[in-house]
Amino acid sequence: MKAKLAFFLLASCIAVSAQAAKKSSEPAPWMQEPDSFMGIQFDQKFVYSVPECPAGYEIPKEICRRAPYQGLYITMGGPSIGFGYGLSVMAKNGPVDSFYLTTPSENYLHLTQLFITKYGSPTSRSTESVKTKGGGAFTNEILAWKGKKIEIVVEKYTSDINTSSATLRTIASKAKAIQDVDQKINGAASKL
């Protein structure tokens, strides 16, 4: 009887410690997941949320959008965040699919500080080596936040070593984009 009790207690301890180890290796849920960015809601139709920019050369006093190109809108007159930036919005089917903010790479530390202050610590951090056409090598830093509906990726070097970026994307639009690419590949492969 004592042997059975000791075995049961030992098995219970092992099961509890295994479960605790599993829980500690899983990332904590992201508690500061946004439902908007710069005052624009992800789930509202973008064309109704942000007015079209006025014609002419006058600098807009509030955020506005230029005419779209295949669902991509360039915005102007966005709020001041302490450094210069460009903001584009992808909204193919009405609501916002993604926001794409770019800034010179010398603003990267300010950009990361803003995002960490607003959205908390990233759920993951990574680095990768980037080589230029001229042969120079740099280390790209990537911060990522992943929630139930939204994913944010901040990169030190995006398309070149002079540009940092932040991409805020809905998980649903990312899944749809992957599905669309798979369909195109399968369609092209069937023609071989």
Question: For each of these PLM feature ranges, what is it?
Answer:
Residues 11-18:
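Hydrophobic h-region of N-terminal signal peptides that target proteins for export
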Residues 21-68, 98-192:
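Non-cytosolic coordination micro-motifs
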Residues 11, 80, 90-92, 134-136, ...:
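Sterically constrained small-residue positions within well-ordered secondary structures
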Residues 1-6:
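Bacterial N-terminal signal peptides that target proteins for export
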